[in-house]
Amino acid sequence: MPIFNPDNVLLSDARTGAVPSAHGTLITQQVIENSKIMQLGKIIEMTDNAGNPVMEKEFTYLAEGPGAYWVGEAEPIETSKAKWLEAKIVAKKLGVIIPVSREFLHYSVAGFFSEIQPLIAEAFYKKFDEAGILNVDNPFEVSIEQSVAAAATGVEGDINYDNILAVEDKLIENGFEANAFISTVQNTTALRNAVKTENGVATPIYDRSSKSIDGLPTVNLKSAEMEKGVLYAGDFNYLYYGIPYTLNYQVSEEATLTTITDGEGKAINLFEREMIALRATMDLGLMIANDKAFAKLAPVAEP
């Protein structure tokens, strides 16, 4: 039986299946490199004991480390236990639909994915971050936004020196320390102006060269759903994600895309416009181990 070679098979002859391994790996790498959740969180290998991928995975995490004791000569050393807790991460299927020209049907499968893989990756990581951070169109039971609400760790006010410290203090009060911030590029001006002046000496809390807030790494979430004036702080050691399965795809020529519209707001009919649509799917898991590990600064809500 001939071996499938994506370099030699036209997309028109292979309209469904797994994304070719090399391109699937590149897409996954691009998602990992650009997703803010994946940049800051910890990955969980979502496989069973035999190494097979699973959509749900139970795991343990270190909630409290072992203690240490002063010991005199000839005295027994006390036994100290670390505190480990059980958690479960659940994956959901994420699909993206990308309409492209019919000419791509004459590309090889490999050539097609070489052209389109950046678009697929961007669609995946934007959607995953919006769900896991902002709780927008979220299939998971958790998100950073939900954690802030559950733990009551929100601070209302403008982005300034004192309010940023107040957000960090919300975590400190619960026994956590922030190790990163999530911001948006729209906050840059406010962050540059977040300065404390004492005795004529101005101390900025934002470092423009390293793009850090209070010495902590800061990433900008590129999303229209991320409001100007919002900052998230957290101990991202309590944020977990998983990628259990390889990517799959399907090509359609006749569908009407109701979730994608043209410049006039009309649904796109592929047949009428001589287009095709790629539907790619990726399984992603998300877990937040402690709501109190996250806090948020947001503008005062309008009455």
PLM regions with names:
Residues P53, K81, K92, G175-E177, ...:
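A short, structural micro-pattern
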Residues G65-G67, G95, F104, K126, ...:
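Short loop/turn segments at secondary-structure transitions that flank enzyme active sites
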